[in-house]
Amino acid sequence: MDRHALGGGGALEIEKTPEAAEDMESEPALAAAREAERVPPWREQVTARGMVAALLIGVVYTVIVMKLSLTTGLIPTLNVSAALLAFLALRGWTHALDRLGIASRPFTRQENTVIQTCAVACYTIGYGGGFGSFLLGLNKKTYELSGASTPGNVPGSYKEPGIGWMTGFLLSTSFVGLLTLLPLRKVLVIDYKLTYPSGTATAVLINGFHTPQGDKNAKKQVRGFLRYFGISFLWSFFQWFYTGGDVCGFLQFPTFGLKAWKHTFFFDFSLTYVGAGMICSHLVNLSLLFGAILSWGIMWPLIGKQKGNWYSAKASESSMSGLFGYKSFICIALLVGDGFYNFVKVIVVTLKSVRERSRRRGLNNRVADADTMAIDDMQRNEVFNRDNIPTWMAYTGYTLLSVIAVVLIPVMFRQVKWYYVIIAYLLAPALGFCNAYGTGLTDMNMGYNYGKIALFIFAAWAGKDDGVVAGLVGCGLVKQLVLISADLMHDFKTGHLTLTSPRSMLVGQVVGTLMGCVVAPLTFFLFYKAFDVGDPNGYWKAPYALIYRNMAIIGVEGFSALPRHCLQLCAGFFAFAVLANLARDFLPRRYGRYMPLPMAMAVPFLVGASFAIDMCAGSLVVFLWHRFDGKRAALLVPAVASGLICGDGIWTFPSSLLALAKVKPPICMKFIPGN
């Protein structure tokens, strides 16, 4: 799971309303400073030092998001952290050169924006490329976990991971999304004035960095980041010495007793998830805990008692015809229910907005923005329109890349017919526009939900023999096309508010995407070879690989693939997901804001409760910090959380190299009953 899937991105963002963002953007002092500031040409906004910094940040965060994808699948938004690191890296570099008496190019907000865009595009491939979901769902282990004898899961319907074909798949699908809506960027950003709240919040952050007060605050954030990065890295290094065997170390510490530990209720000292909990909202973290209590505390023990009644007593713990089948399909019901509601919600909001805009135009009642437009807005629009991107380039590139995909993808996957790819690419512009428009209004990128719909359609269309592979690949095709086009509009909004040229933003996106298509497969294979990825009872569970494959099986076989009484339970949880969302949207805010998020609730159903406890620990830290020192907390929470995530995440790299070299920890720390 990622920031797009969980609440469409908005749920995991640092809460900032568009109105507040625009107020900050329009402050007289900031406006005057920007008016006096020279806006560099677009070629000066894309620098060699910036691309090196973006590559380093992209690699660091690719390692982090890959670890998160292959453990729980829950990924908080890291855009704020990436913008902070981009600022720290370049400001530190320029200060170091100044002390040495070496003249250097000034570090501008435009260069900062391009670096952040490039780095985010790079690590987005790490979690959006499907390494923990639809691509991993193609491998043999996931095929076996889904049940080799399961109807629809036909023999041979798997493809083992490979650096070559994975890189080729990403290269043939990731760039098309950048060109889909390129001719409509002015319509979405300037004419329709869509807010793109996450893009606006990132712009406000970057603009704030490049002020005298922002520079002072950044120094405090640097110290906070480095301190907690060091603590997190050293703690992870220390923990490693005690993991010399199965179920060993602090990761298996029975915090609440051995009985609770058996049901996965323990604090595992994972500072990555403590940091993630500090970034995510309290509602997300409490929803995770509620889902963990409901599933591992109540439902799974009760269903487990029906062994021999509801399902065969001979079924193994990981069999889809046993308890694991209930865990998997009920989780899917929550995800699909939440996705269905939010998909319909965004479509309705989009249609209402288009209708209202059309009605105002028809009545000639449009607000006369041109006469009252602020000088600051006029400057932004002038910069945004100055460096035009030729429309012919977008159309030609889209056609050329589409032809390449139509040829290559059926060669990679014999189950995927060439006309499946053509249909996906013909529908992409319309679907991409709907998604980008809805994202601009609601901050909910529905790319993953479009992908799930495509999964069911292609799986059912391809039939029993080819359906699973065709569904998973079709899901990846549509998701990449729709997701990336909306992300690009987010970045254009950020560039519009930071006076950054659309050309330099597009170059940053293209370079970052190219970096990601190379870095992400290499990072994935480092983990895939070093650890037992996909083991449902291990640390590297990669739960969404199995979820996506099981969704494809349902697309092929229908509800006959479900275990006994599972359909009724799935229907109940699907309805719960819809009703919970309805209650949150239509009840008075003082009641609706306490409704749990079904998408967050679903994650612990397969993964376990321990990481939810870690996330809640992070939430508790933020709550207490704001309670006793709110001003300092508002400044340092993002930096401290980023330090905790990066320190623990970076340790994964040397630990995986040690595992590949067959170097094992010297101690196994286990806990057993005293009697």
From Swiss-Prot:
Induction context: In root stele by iron deficiency.
Compositional bias (Gly residues): 1-11
GO CC field: plasma membrane
Keyword annotations: Membrane, Transmembrane, Transmembrane helix, Transport
UniProt-listed InterPro entries: OPT, YSL-like
Gene Ontology molecular functions: iron-nicotianamine transmembrane transporter activity; oligopeptide transmembrane transporter activity
Tissue specificity: Expressed in roots.
Cellular localization per UniProt: Membrane
Transmembrane helix in keyword set: yes
Transmembrane regions: 50-70, 73-93, 118-138, 162-182, 231-251, 283-303, 329-349, 393-413, 421-441, 453-473, 507-527, 567-587, 605-625, 633-653
Membrane topology: Multi-pass membrane protein
Family designation: Belongs to the YSL (TC 2.A.67.2) family.
Protein name: Probable metal-nicotianamine transporter YSL16
